[in-house]
A protein has these predicted regions:
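Short loop/turn and low-complexity linker motifs enriched in small/turn-promoting residues
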Residues: 1-91
Length: 91
């Protein structure tokens, strides 16, 4: 029986602002990892409601509420907007 779900992130190719470094990945208001350009990461989480956002160069993306079911994967892409703010969107 599967008792976890997964939140997956993919960060595509870089623009000039992206070259400044890694995004911090925040799930449930805790920094759990970082993600570099052209990197993918997956995080096992308990089923239920979670809150996801990114931090980059002192800026924060909009917080997204994610409902994760057991055995399911919720996928997102991350990038920077042209003005440098991190952006998180469903894949």
């Amino acid at each position: 029986m599967v008792d976890v779900g997964t939140i997956s992130l993919h960060r595509g190719r870089a623009n000039l602002v992206d070259l400044a470094g890694a995004f911090k990945v925040v799930i449930d208001r805790t920094v759990i990892s970082s993600i570099l350009t052209r990197e993918s990461k997956a995080f096992d989480v308990p089923p239920g409601r979670h809150f996801l956002h990114l931090r980059f160069l002192g800026r924060q993306s909009k917080e997204i509420e994610v409902l994760v079911s057991p055995g399911e994967e919720e996928c997102f892409t991350c990038r920077t907007a042209w003005y440098g703010w991190p952006v998180l969107t469903p894949a």
